[in-house]
């Protein structure tokens, strides 16, 4: 795991500076995020509070009736330690109103609906407080497509999108995220008893090492096998990365003009300012 070890103090300064500068570029001073009680959102809350000041950070916990009460307790713990603005908004009435019309929906559809309901709440708070929405998906999740398009993957700014889950743990330790949050099993908490690693079928530490070699170091299949990764595992992960690529792109626009958005018409976020 040597390749995944990071200089946490340097990483902290980079990400804090990134949040501060990108929010400033938009002409704003505040940020809003979903605080789930998990380690990813907790880390983003810590980074945002340092970058913008706790008074400029708005966190929402949005439980559903099947959510683990521990999740809300951990989210509240993080918010209270940081002194950020905090609110709990129950999404059960909105979600259940829809599923009364489609009662046969499976867990995946229900989970996606919950994630998108939370996204609409965050963007409403963004409008209410003139605050930029911060993403909380890490690099592992983004590469695997382990998230809901236009749900938890939706944000204006993602400070941790280029660090693997293993590195999220490292930086969280260094920044003093509560032990209860760091040590619990990762879970999207979309249905009772759900855990990320059980659903994925492998551990984050296993897949992070493979993804690092595959993506960052550009090792080919034979090189990965020579390092001890099984061919089945390599093929499974490569398939997940390839099949979820559409989640990492803007909607594809049919090109019919000389300058097409996101192809020939590309400018930095602070263009013209």
UniProtKB/Swiss-Prot annotation:
The keyword Ligase applies. Its EC number is 6.3.1.5. One of its GO terms (cellular component) is cytoplasm. Mg(2+) binds at residues 40, 141. It comes from the Bacteria. It catalyses: deamido-NAD(+) + NH4(+) + ATP = AMP + diphosphate + NAD(+) + H(+). Pathway: Cofactor biosynthesis; NAD(+) biosynthesis; NAD(+) from deamido-NAD(+) (ammonia route): step 1/1. GO terms for biological process: NAD biosynthetic process. Keywords: ATP-binding, Ligase, Magnesium, Metal-binding, NAD, Nucleotide-binding. Deamido-NAD(+) binds at residue 116. Pfam families: NAD_synthase. One of its GO terms (molecular function) is NAD+ synthase activity. ATP binds at residues 34-41, 136, 165, 187. NCBIfam families: nadE, PRK13980.1. Belongs to the NAD synthetase family. Homodimer. Catalyzes the ATP-dependent amidation of deamido-NAD to form NAD. Uses ammonia as a nitrogen source. This is NH(3)-dependent NAD(+) synthetase. It comes from Geotalea uraniireducens (strain Rf4). The lineage of its organism: Bacteria, Pseudomonadati, Thermodesulfobacteriota, Desulfuromonadia, Geobacterales.
């Amino acid at each position: 795991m040597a390749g995944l070890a990071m200089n946490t103090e340097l990483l902290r300064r980079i990400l804090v500076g990134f949040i501060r500068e990108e929010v400033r570029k938009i002409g704003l001073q505040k940020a809003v995020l979903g605080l789930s009680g998990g380690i990813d959102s907790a880390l983003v809350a810590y980074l945002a509070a340092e970058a913008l000041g706790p008074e400029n950070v708005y966190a929402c916990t949005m439980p559903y009736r099947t959510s683990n009460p521990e999740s809300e307790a951990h989210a509240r713990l993080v918010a209270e330690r940081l002194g950020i603005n905090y609110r709990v908004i129950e999404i059960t009435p909105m979600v259940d109103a829809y599923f009364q019309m489609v009662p046969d929906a499976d867990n995946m559809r229900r989970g996606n609906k919950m994630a998108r309901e939370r996204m609409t709440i965050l963007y409403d708070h963004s409008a209410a407080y003139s605050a930029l929405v911060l993403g909380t998906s890490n690099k592992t999740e983004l590469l695997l497509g382990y998230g809901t398009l236009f749900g938890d993957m939706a944000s204006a700014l993602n400070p941790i999108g280029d660090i693997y889950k293993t590195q999220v743990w490292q930086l969280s330790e260094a920044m003093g995220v509560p032990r209860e949050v760091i040590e619990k099993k990762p879970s999207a908490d979309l249905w009772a008893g759900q855990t990320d690693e059980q659903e994925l079928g492998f551990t984050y530490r296993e897949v992070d090492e493979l993804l690092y070699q595959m993506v960052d170091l550009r090792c080919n299949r034979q090189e990965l096998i020579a390092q001890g990764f099984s061919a089945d595992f390599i093929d499974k992960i490569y398939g997940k990365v390839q099949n979820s690529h559409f989640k990492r792109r803007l909607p594809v626009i049919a090109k019919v003009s000389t300058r097409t958005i996101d192809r020939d018409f590309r400018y930095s976020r602070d263009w013209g300012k």
